[in-house]
Amino acid sequence: MRLSFIIFAISLLAGGSGAAEALHPASDVLTLRGTNQGASTGKRSLRYDNNAERAGEEDDEERAFPGAEELSRLANLAHTSKADSLGTSLKNFFKQLDKANVNPSNIHKYGFSGEEFDQLRKRFGTWYRHYKDIE
């Protein structure tokens, strides 16, 4: 038998099981959840929304969406233009949507679900799939 095995066996027998202690975390690391920390049924927000944080900067996502009047104008432009000859205002709007991580499969979540925005959604989908990487 090798000397290292003998030393290891003696250390295990003399000092208890060191390997078993290493497998279990220390008791001071374990914490219990309080009764008021249980699962809640309320809606949770993953963003911090306090005034100090929002004083100067808006999120890219919020900045990408124009007001109702501008949105109506863009929807009208989408009705009158073809997908391969979009105006610069529509291209810029689509680029802003892309920067805000909006894509054709989740655009309906951002309020573009009405019939008046149907053509705008179609133009955005075509631009996103075919023209986004070219420009």
Curated annotation (Swiss-Prot):
Gene ablation phenotype (knockout): Leads to gain of virulence on potato lines carrying defense protein R10.
Segments for region (Disordered): 34-64
Subcellular location per the Swiss-Prot or TrEMBL entry: Secreted; Host nucleus; Host cytoplasm
Biased composition (Polar residues): 34-43
One cellular component term from this protein's GO annotations in UniProt: extracellular region
Position of sequence motif RxLR-dEER: 44-63
Keyword Nucleotide-binding in record: no
Keyword terms: Host cytoplasm, Host nucleus, Secreted, Signal, Virulence
Induction per the UniProt record: Expression is induced during host plant infection.
The keyword Cell cycle is annotated on this UniProt entry: no
Membership in a protein family: Belongs to the RxLR effector family.
Protein name: RxLR effector protein Avr10
Native source species: Phytophthora infestans (strain T30-4) (Potato late blight agent)
